[in-house]
């Protein structure tokens, strides 16, 4: 589908994945090499100011402390789950707000990734966002559920509040070898973080399941059709395996339902006597399927130095789907939203469009 003459062409890319794989460094390296000319490229870092200093407490530190207190038997699983659910909702809020700020200004998709013809080349604005709401609302809660830190009730509640993706939402899931991933986490040593290899294994599996879920759904997969073939998920078995091995669920070209996020969501408390989900849980699973199906999910291996990873990221971006602005002033409004997000939610400067760039849009 080609754009209308004169409409703005916008590329939005969300670089996501387990913490510590190097996604932020890769995105920053990509944007740093760009000259300040059209297309304007803006990098929105994780909203650390919102998470760590906007309110009275530091959410990052609270998350690690809660997990540590649970592991030390200082609090119960129910208490930890209540804390974690609140914190995950807080972590996802900036992304949900950004989506709603952009929603009126994002129009139709200009090309499908599987088009036979060339993708549109002109890009007026390239927006790279460090993470997407799916991280805080799906992947991290699910990883903590697999570790026994939050209940499926909490996971279901968060999934049900995942915002509908905007057209042209390109989600790039970064990955890395397990040992290199652990080494990078040890090296970065962010304030408040605790190295937890079991949690690292859980979040790696959650993101692999996310990528497999997208492939499963886009190839015609139907969770209702395949539900009967799934075994009941046992978090304790997952934790025992993750604690002993560096196993990560493989990314599959033709995944089955057992390779997807749905595999961790079949637990007895939400099933009827036949083993099928009760209505409310089924609706939650439908929301998950609809949200993930609407995303354009890609994977990117970040093995190697930042410059090489940035080059691989650039090559991937060349084939991603674009959208057009929904009205003549859309490009200016999107730049303003990006600038406000960077200014108020990031600790250090994401590259904001300058005043001159915004006014010239």
From Swiss-Prot:
Annotated GO biological process: DNA biosynthetic process; TMP biosynthetic process
Binding positions for substrate per the UniProt entry: 64, 88, 190
Known catalytic reactions: thymidine + ATP = dTMP + ADP + H(+)
E.C. code: 2.7.1.21
EC class of the enzyme, as a word: transferase
Residues reported in the UniProt entry to bind ATP: 17-24, 184
Keyword Nucleotide-binding attached: yes
Any one GO molecular function term: ATP binding
Record keywords: ATP-binding, DNA synthesis, Early protein, Kinase, Nucleotide-binding, Transferase
One Pfam family linked to the record: Herpes_TK
Active-site positions on this chain: 46 (proton acceptor)
HAMAP family reported for this sequence: HSV_KITH
Purpose of the protein: Catalyzes the transfer of the gamma-phospho group of ATP to thymidine to generate dTMP in the salvage pathway of pyrimidine synthesis. The dTMP serves as a substrate for DNA polymerase during viral DNA replication. Allows the virus to be reactivated and to grow in non-proliferative cells lacking a high concentration of phosphorylated nucleic acid precursors.
Subunit (UniProt): Homodimer.
Name of the protein described by the UniProt record: Thymidine kinase
UniProt source species: Saimiriine herpesvirus 1 (strain MV-5-4-PSL)
